[in-house]
Amino acid sequence: MHSTLCQVFAAVSAMLVNTATLAAGPCTAVSGAAVPVVVELYTSEGCDSCPPADRWLSKTISERGKDAAFIPLAYHVDYWDHIGWKDPFAQPAFTQRQSALASTSGASGVYTPQIFVNGKEDRSWTGGAARLAAAGRASVKFSVASAWKSDGAALALIVSGKLVEPAPSLRLRYAVTENGLVSAVKAGENRGVTLRHDAVVRATGALTVDTNGAFSLNVALPRAMKLGNSQLHVIAEDARGAPLAAATLVCPV
């Protein structure tokens, strides 16, 4: 494992040479020993039922501290943008992911706020808790390295890593999230309310793994992101989308 991490670190460093100004050097992580608890909140600033769910997620993040097995992801959807307030963090791709999850998990439908835990709809959060216990030991291991990159006009994240034991049925996805976001809503159902968000997904997608188990990606990010409040999650899943392992990187700036 140590040699694999060294190889990944060297690969990322090589990718960064002569490309742009780095906000900081590469940082590395190894996937955790436990199967992760991936909590996906689908929310919108245009929905007046969503602030309690946003607060619940922030509270849960605070309570879980630095629990490496807890992966919180807040996806802002765009289907409420037409009722008076355009959510600045919403993306059509997040709406598409919610619809796909609802379909494959047998959920009752698509709505906000909606929470999925490891791909399954979970309404128990309304009682103050959700099913967030770890689901056993991880059967997959991988190492990952990343570094912020800026050329003064654009912001990006360079990601590289390697699965210890590649398998055709495995797939990897990433999510870059940001904490501490604040919006003063001026129209719509939440008009006049100041909303605070954590774990807001700013970029997400699939990671292509080669036959040797290696993967790499250069992710374009919103220029306004505050790197000190941001983190990268990489999640290994089986063919059905069930999480098997995860790693989180909070890189220095």
What does each model-found stretch correspond to?
Residues 8-12, 111:
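Short loop/turn motifs at secondary-structure junctions
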Residues 1-9:
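Bacterial N-terminal signal peptides that target proteins for export
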Residues 8, 22-23, 115:
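Intrinsically disordered and other compositionally biased segments
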Residues 2, 22-111:
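Active-site-proximal cofactor/substrate-binding loop regions of enzyme domains
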Residues 86-253:
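Short, conserved sequence motifs used for protein processing/export or organelle targeting and
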Residues 18-20:
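N-terminal signal peptide c-region/cleavage motif recognized by signal peptidases
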